[in-house]
Amino acid sequence: MNLKDHIREVPDFPKPGILFYDISTLLADPDAWQVTMGRMAKVVAPRLPDVLAGIESRGFLVAAPLALKLGLGFVMVRKKGKLPGATVRHEYALEYGTDTVEVQEGAVLPGQRVVILDDLLATGGTLNAASELLGKMGANVVGAACIIELSFLKGRERTKVPIDSLVAYDS
């Protein structure tokens, strides 16, 4: 199955000149979603993770069902102020300013093997921030995976962990 056939292309979203790759149509097709999760399992399982970390918010849609499929724990990497209780934070640079990601304290234990998941790899900034945050907590980030890679943005070259993607777009 060609997963690209199930990913809708939305021109001029979220702003003019941007071509948005929408996984909503992939999620809505049970056969395509099963194939997607099966392929994700094949690339993630060999990294022998103890836990999967999903990046807010569409990364949750990938990581949570995959964690269930693989019998692993699931951890949410969220934007600042979205998690209750004590958190560990990491601030990172954006093109114009900064942003912060956080994880609940104790959600990842020192030495645990973690794979980070998201729906899409663009520049790699958020993925690197999540990796640095989890590393700061003592986790061993052994890889990352996403459904879509925008290879023309060269995020793979900027990421600090091995990454797998199921489909790539060159423009």
From Swiss-Prot:
The gene is apt. Homodimer. Pathway: Purine metabolism; AMP biosynthesis via salvage pathway; AMP from adenine: step 1/1. Belongs to the purine/pyrimidine phosphoribosyltransferase family. This is Adenine phosphoribosyltransferase. GO terms for biological process: adenine salvage; AMP salvage; purine ribonucleoside salvage. It comes from the Bacteria. One of its GO terms (molecular function) is adenine binding. Its EC number is 2.4.2.7. Keywords: Cytoplasm, Glycosyltransferase, Purine salvage, Transferase. PANTHER family: ADENINE PHOSPHORIBOSYLTRANSFERASE. InterPro entries: Ade_phspho_trans, PRibTrfase_dom, PRTase-like, UPRTase/APRTase. Pfam families: Pribosyltran. Catalyzes a salvage reaction resulting in the formation of AMP, that is energically less costly than de novo synthesis. It is found in: Cytoplasm. It catalyses: AMP + diphosphate = 5-phospho-alpha-D-ribose 1-diphosphate + adenine. It comes from Rhodospirillum rubrum (strain ATCC 11170 / ATH 1.1.1 / DSM 467 / LMG 4362 / NCIMB 8255 / S1). GO terms for cellular component: cytoplasm.
